[in-house]
Design a protein with these regions (language model features):
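Conserved phosphate/ATP/ADP-binding segment of small-molecule kinases
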Residues: 1-91
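Compositionally biased, low-complexity linear motifs
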Residues: 36, 164-165
């Protein structure tokens, strides 16, 4: 209710950006670019379909060097699958999918992904590791009440390494 719709203001903002981050529905709702063979409502979200979306966005916005999407599959309100993709100057990366069976709070999950991706891109030379960090960080956020991701880098890296035990070492 701010006077304009996202589709009216986002194209200009994205034209000045070198990275765009969204969820599985944003490109369609804001830019009219639909991932082929995807049904978000039915929980059918295929990572490779977003290669097409990233290609279309990069063709439309030459400033973009990186484009990333979170991919949520809804099994129920408290059980989701969670992954993400990253297109980086033509290369395409897919993160492992997490099965989050006891969601505490979804609020802040996208912010945690964005923060994790920015941290990952600045910290790790490998783009795959940067994406994996973002997905793991946001996965952990789903287990925390409130919109702040109160986890450490070590805890995120532990989950990235395959430790899904839920143990927190402090």
């Amino acid at each position: 209710k701010w006077g304009k719709k996202a589709a009216e203001v986002m194209p200009e903002l994205v034209s000045f950006s070198d990275i765009a981050i969204g969820n599985e529905e944003d490109a369609e709702k804001v830019f009219g670019i639909k991932a082929p063979d995807v049904n978000v409502t039915a929980g059918k979200v295929e990572a490779d379909a977003y290669r097409y979306v990233a290609g279309e966005l990069s063709a439309r916005f030459s400033s973009l060097r990186s484009i990333s999407f979170t991919l949520r599959g809804s099994v129920s309100a408290s059980h989701n699958t969670w992954s993400g993709v990253l297109w980086d100057q033509g290369a395409f990366y897919t993160a492992p999918q997490f099965d989050i069976t006891h969601i505490v709070d979804r609020v802040g999950g996208g912010d945690a992904f964005s923060a994790g991706l920015i941290y990952g891109l600045l910290t790790y030379p490998e783009k795959q590791k940067a994406l994996n960090f973002a997905v793991a960080a946001s996965c952990l956020k789903h287990t925390i009440s409130g919109d702040f991701n109160m986890v450490t880098v070590g805890e995120v890296e532990q989950l990235m390494a395959g430790d899904g035990s839920g143990r927190v070492s402090r």
